Amino acid sequence: ADQWEVLGTKLATQFSNSIRNNFGFLNRCEDSDPNARDKTFRQEGRKVFKEVVPLAAAHIEAHLAALEQAPTAVRRYWLHQANHGMNQLVIKKLVGADAGADVAPLILDEFANTASAGSIIAFHKHRDDLAAGDLGVICSFGAGYSIGSVVVRKR
């Protein structure tokens, strides 16, 4: 069995109205239609994309900088698996170039969007080829916005 050292963890949240749901326990206190459009999940997809990409890239970059590591020193990025284009843009902002599945593997074709579990599934399925000493970043990001990352090194 392979072993991994956790070099650091980092969490961040930033409020956004681009993803929201106004339904909750306080709705019983107001005279409004419980089936109204604002009581269901809604998302402004393009706005979310434009807001999350720089947030995720900056989060990962700051996390690596705190550990005195450059984004280009990372052998593999296991990112949130909701949108291929979003992942590619995050990686491009980090390493300055397009990256293939060897650097940022995808599992969307096999599992679709598995929410925050996607980065862990990607890690599970795409880690065996790394050598001792290789660095990796596991990062999930999503609604609200929340971002969590773990920087690991293979032993």
Residue spans of the language-model regions?
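Alpha-helix termini
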Residues: L64-E68, V95-D98
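A generic secondary-structure signal
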Residues: A62-A66, K125-H126
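Short, flexible active-site loop motifs that bind/organize anionic cofactors or intermediates
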Residues: R46, L64, D109
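Short, functionally important structural connectors and interaction interfaces within domains
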Residues: D33, T40, E61, G100-L106
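Claisen-condensing/thiolase-fold acyl-transfer catalytic domains that form or cleave C-C bonds
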Residues: V53, A57, R75-R155
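Condensing-enzyme catalytic core mediating Claisen C-C bond formation in acyl metabolism
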Residues: A1-K50, P54, A58, F141, ...
